[in-house]
Amino acid sequence: MHRRNFLQWGSLGLSAITFSGFRNSGTGNKPLVISTWDAGIAANAAAWKILRSGGRALDAVEKGVMVTENEINCCVGLGANPDRDGFVTLDACIMDENANCGSVAFLERIKHPISVARRVMEKTPHVMLVGSGAQQFAVSEGFPLESGKLSDDAEKAYKNWLKKSEYKPVINVERSKSPMANNVPTRLENGQWNHDTIGMVAIDVQGNLSGSCTTSGMGFKMRGRLGDSPIIGAGLFVDNEIGAATATGQGEDVIRICGSHLVVENMRNGFSPENACKAAVERIVKVKGVEKCKEIQVGFIAINKRGEYGGYCLQKGFNFAVCYADDKNFMVDGKYIL
């Protein structure tokens, strides 16, 4: 049953709005799926199998990110880096074309938090479940409890972090230039970003939009910390009359501006997807300041109702995957402002 309706607003004469195009939004493609980072190539491929057969965007965005969640040594699922106490905790949210949404946070030992989030949406009167309650619900829905053992990569990283760890809040961790800082995403020695989230948005052949976002959160975070990824309006937002957006990067700064909701509202006001994302990134710089933004990364991606897409980020290095045909699944480098 679908009983969650989040911020359903009136149409406000939306049919009169025109969206400006730009080069990497193409001519408008339906169906279309886009997702954050290079892990999005495999995720898009799984989502595309559903979209090309006329399937629903909601099913596509769930199945797509499950591919990434399922990786053993990866940045998103149970194979990701743990918190400071050595436990992997997962967050996810999902939203459909009817403004139904579901979310889980601080979830342990469940392989596919995105699917649990969908069950929250479809089988409870709530939007979000957290912690032991989310785990209890997942088990009651037939999700098996997995081993709490860290992956080989995560265990190695955790032991390395413990050598110099300090168990206290790191207020200005974004200023750290260490490749093994207490947070991710952070800039690595090779200039790339260590990221920990996949967000996906899609439009199906019916013209309906949906989105998903799943993460392990910041590596070595304080126990109980949540970022933007499971928060509807921050890490993900869908308005079927306008468009859909998702975020990646320093979650606290995405939350401060209700980032994905802001991107969609920018599109409501006539911005192209790319320019809508750019305006949201500019808002972060305005709120946080240029100097503090130089050592963090935030990126947004978005699609509109016409099947146009775009993305923008703070720093060079963010990219996203785009798929709209069997032979059209490719990476796009996000434009950046710093």
What does each of the following model-derived ranges do?
Residues 2, 8-16, 25-338:
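Alpha/propeptide regions of enzymes that mature by internal proteolysis
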